[in-house]
């Protein structure tokens, strides 16, 4: 739970309103970067950025009726982004005429909800709240994909229990070995364009590659959806990312997202939903498989969604899928999820952003200026051109063509072609001595396509080690994990320290062809497919759309907006004065002055505290001095699916991949303080519950990852953002160590919405206001989390 979040669990709250007043694929495979992000550009607070008004001036807004899916160019009242339009369709209980906007808290009933190996904990939550029947079994999809190589009796029993539950409730179920859940959601048509599709996994963003609004939920949310068909969501700030140019030969979607993560690496899109856009020509250079890769890794970029438009490229892809489905499953007819009739219906009125839709920020990237690129080691925010790493002769021990990010048939074909070219008509060459190259397809159908094309056989002949279609090493499970001292390169999505094995190993990320070329050579290398366009010397990125004329117009619109806002404020104040008597008006001014005086005296307004919720929370500060501490650092993946792990063990392993000394340094009752973007990464709820198991009641950070905030709320872990405290700790303790006991004291006065810091014995004491903690959040925490809250509500029904 984070103080600035105000979830409503099963009700709708409107957080704020806004006035819109603004105007052959592998032949393209490959990023030479010599640009740096703007110095000092650190957008740490997701909700503090001034909205950028797009496309229209205030005078162009007209009260014109329009379809909710009006095409760009259609002027409507209260224009919406694509994200807002989709949420509008799946929000329930809205007041009549309400149009949702970024910042609103809404109750959503998503089209689909997928769970995977975490389904059994969801089952236990589902039953513990008193639910006996899934609200809508057509809404739920269950897949087994994470720990499929674990043949222990306990894991096999868990898998069988999950299957039995799914069968009992008539839920669509996909067994271990069928593929990764996200890929199944795509290829089976569950993630349909224009729908809100969620999963209890952080890479649900991937559905945006087929123009579905995909976003992660956590286990407790999934249980709520199973039981009631709905859960809560706050519509995030929305960023527009415009692509210009076209991908050069040898550049991939993986290179695009690595570039975005590395070049915009100051949390520009942290906790945002991203809408990708560009000209028809530009977007046609991004096939659906590349879009899936890009959307998938918007998670690593810090976003909670990343959606592409519904366009002709998507239509062609859907047509091909529908034709294959009709050929292979003629008996299904209209019951199939991907049909030509459904496609026709979709494209009769596809959702698109309105003219004048409001975006929190706008960024652009010129695809023509990209070249092959590698992320790492152990970070997606650090990236280097392949050609520069080739000159360093970095030896590798392991290579991986795995994950929902890049192990589809097209990716497997790209890797196989590296070996075919090296064969030059002769025998397929072997992987370099001392290198282990692990391959597993994103799904069984994708593997079958690769087998029919001969690509799978090429990789096996080269000496690749086959694993089942599942998550495997990407999650740090199964065979082939990185050992201490290893260097690995992977086509997956995360290379965080300890993610794919030992924290003493180094992991890089790259496209499938770069991974294959590296495995063949025994060191990081590219396949040599990149053809640099004439005149390209650097990657072109920036704020805005990349269109100087349009961006200049937007700047003018922003200036006008500021003037109009000031005028509206003055008019509003005058109207209120006129509506009141002179005495009342004088009283209002007097009260305002009194309030200011009271604030100067430190006498803050009080909020109500519900029974069972503490008025104050205090303790000694233990400081983890790092930004972007991810969920793998907080709670390693190797423990995530050990459902029988004890609370004491959780307390011992918390922060293990970040700093093993944390367990001995931190004590029950401490206040954990960390840097910015704390808790980024996966949806595992143990990142929150393990901190609670350690006896730590409150986490303070410069900012939080959205999914960690959600898990905190649902599991009754308190949190508050105090960037000033992080800055002061770093100023005072110059020597950077992973974890330190500071001797400082922290107190959160919930009733007064104020925090007080005492900087050591005899040190300075200072205070500042923080966001109010509303009653509904207090209620959830007071009863021990959302699961118990829902159970209580069900028992009262």
Curated annotation (Swiss-Prot):
GO terms for biological process: lysine biosynthetic process via aminoadipic acid. One of its GO terms (cellular component) is mitochondrion. SUPFAM superfamilies: Aconitase iron-sulfur domain (SSF53732), LeuD/IlvD-like (SSF52016). Binds 1 [4Fe-4S] cluster per subunit. Keywords: Amino-acid biosynthesis, Iron, Iron-sulfur, Lyase, Lysine biosynthesis, Metal-binding, Mitochondrion, Transit peptide. Residues 1-47 form a transit peptide. It is found in: Mitochondrion. InterPro entries: Acnase/IPM_dHydase_lsu_aba_1/3, Acoase/IPM_deHydtase_lsu_aba, Aconitase/3IPM_dehydase_swvl, Aconitase_4Fe-4S_BS, Aconitase_4Fe-4S_dom, AconitaseA/IPMdHydase_ssu_swvl, Homoaconitase_mito, Homoaconitase_swivel. Its cofactor is [4Fe-4S] cluster. GO terms for molecular function: 4 iron, 4 sulfur cluster binding; homoaconitate hydratase activity; metal ion binding. It is an enzyme of class 4 (lyase). [4Fe-4S] cluster binds at residues 404, 471, 474. Pathway: Amino-acid biosynthesis; L-lysine biosynthesis via AAA pathway; L-alpha-aminoadipate from 2-oxoglutarate: step 3/5. Signal peptide: none annotated. Its EC number is 4.2.1.36. Belongs to the aconitase/IPM isomerase family. Catalyzes the reversible hydration of cis-homoaconitate to (2R,3S)-homoisocitrate, a step in the alpha-aminoadipate pathway for lysine biosynthesis. This is Homoaconitase, mitochondrial. It comes from Chaetomium globosum (strain ATCC 6205 / CBS 148.51 / DSM 1962 / NBRC 6347 / NRRL 1970) (Soil fungus).
């Amino acid at each position: 739970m984070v103080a600035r979040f105000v979830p409503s669990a099963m009700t709708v709250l409107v957080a704020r309103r806004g006035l819109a007043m603004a105007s052959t694929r592998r032949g393209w495979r490959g990023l030479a970067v010599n640009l740096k992000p703007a110095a000092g550009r650190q957008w740490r607070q997701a909700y503090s950025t001034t909205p950028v008004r797009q496309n229209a001036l205030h005078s162009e807004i007209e009260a014109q009726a329009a379809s909710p899916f009006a095409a760009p160019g259609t002027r409507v009242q209260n224009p919406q982004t694509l994200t807002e339009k989709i949420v509008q369709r799946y929000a329930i209980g809205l007041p009549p005429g309400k149009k949702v906007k970024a910042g609103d808290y809404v109750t959503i009933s998503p089209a689909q909800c997928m769970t995977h190996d975490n389904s059994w904990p969801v089952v236990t939550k589902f039953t513990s709240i008193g639910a006996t029947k899934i609200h809508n079994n057509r809404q739920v999809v269950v897949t087994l994909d994470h720990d499929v190589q674990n043949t222990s009796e306990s894991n096999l029993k868990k898998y069988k229990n999950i299957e039995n539950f799914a069968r009992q409730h008539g839920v669509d179920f996909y067994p271990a070995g069928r593929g990764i859940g996200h890929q199944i959601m795509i290829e089976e048509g569950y993630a349909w364009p224009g729908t809100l599709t969620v999963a209890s996994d952080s890479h649900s963003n991937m559905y945006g590659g087929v123009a579905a609004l995909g976003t992660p939920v956590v286990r407790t949310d999934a249980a709520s959806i199973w039981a009631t068909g709905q859960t809560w969501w706050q519509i995030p700030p929305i960023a527009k990312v415009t692509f210009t140019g076209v991908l050069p030969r040898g550049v991939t979607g993986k290179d695009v997202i690595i570039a975005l993560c590395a070049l915009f690496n100051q949390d520009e899109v942290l906790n945002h939903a991203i809408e990708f856009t560009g000209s028809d020509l530009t977007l046609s250079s991004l096939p659906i498989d590349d879009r899936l890769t890009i959307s998938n890794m918007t998670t690593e970029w810090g976003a909670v969604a990343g959606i592409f438009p519904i366009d002709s490229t998507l239509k062609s892809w859907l047509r091909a899928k529908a034709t294959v489905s009709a050929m292979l499953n003629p008996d299904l007819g209209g019951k199939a999820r991907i049909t030509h009739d459904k496609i026709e219906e979709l494209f009769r009125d596809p959702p698109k952003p309105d003219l004048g839709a409001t975006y929190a920020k706008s960024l652009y990237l010129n695809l023509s200026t990209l070249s092959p690129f590698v992320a790492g080691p152990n970070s997606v925010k650090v990236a280097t051109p392949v050609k520069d790493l080739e000159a360093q002769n970095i030896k590798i021990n392991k290579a991986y063509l795995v994950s929902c990010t890049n192990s589809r048939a097209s990716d497997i074909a790209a890797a196989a072609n590296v070996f075919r070219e090296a064969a030059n008509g002769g025998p397929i060459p072997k992987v370099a001595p001392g290198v282990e190259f692990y391959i597993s397809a994103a799904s069984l159908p994708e593997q079958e396509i690769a087998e029919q094309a001969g690509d799978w056989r090429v990789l096996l002949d080269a000496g690749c080690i086959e694993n089942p279609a599942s998550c495997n090493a990407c999650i740090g499970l199964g065979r082939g994990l990185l050992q201490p001292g290893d260097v690995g390169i992977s086509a997956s999505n995360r290379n965080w320290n300890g993610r794919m094995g030992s924290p003493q190993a180094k992991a890089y990320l790259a496209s499938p062809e770069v991974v294959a070329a590296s495995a063949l050579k025994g060191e990081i290398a590219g396949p040599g497919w990149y053809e640099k366009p004439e005149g390209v010397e650097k990657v072109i990125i920036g704020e805005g759309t990349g269109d100087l004329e349009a961006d200049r117009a937007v700047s003018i619109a922003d200036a006008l907006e500021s003037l109009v806002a000031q005028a509206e404020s003055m008019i509003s104040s005058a109207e209120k004065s006129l509506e009141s008597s002179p005495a009342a008006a004088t009283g209002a001014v007097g009260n305002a002055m009194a309030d200011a005086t009271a604030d100067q005296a430190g006498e803050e307004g009080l909020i109500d505290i519900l029974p069972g919720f503490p008025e104050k929370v205090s303790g000694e500060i233990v400081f983890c001095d790092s930004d972007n501490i991810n969920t793998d650092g907080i709670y390693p993946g190797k423990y995530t699916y050990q459902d029988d792990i004890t609370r004491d063990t959780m307390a011992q392993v918390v922060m293990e991949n970040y700093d093993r000394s944390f367990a001995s340094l931190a004590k029950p009752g401490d206040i954990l303080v960390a840097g910015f973007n704390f808790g980024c990464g996966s949806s595992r709820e143990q990142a929150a519950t393990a901190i609670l198991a350690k006896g730590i009641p409150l986490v303070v950070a410069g900012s939080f990852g959205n999914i960690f905030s959600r898990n905190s709320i649902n599991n009754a872990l308190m949190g508050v953002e105090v960037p000033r405290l992080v800055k002061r700790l770093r100023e005072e303790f110059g020597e950077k160590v992973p974890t330190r006991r500071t001797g400082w004291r922290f107190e959160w006065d919930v009733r007064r919405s104020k925090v007080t810091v005492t900087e050591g014995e005899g040190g300075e004491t200072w205070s500042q206001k923080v966001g109010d903690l509303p009653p509904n959040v207090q209620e959830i925490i007071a009863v021990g989390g959302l699961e118990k809250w829902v159970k209580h509500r069900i028992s009262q029904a």
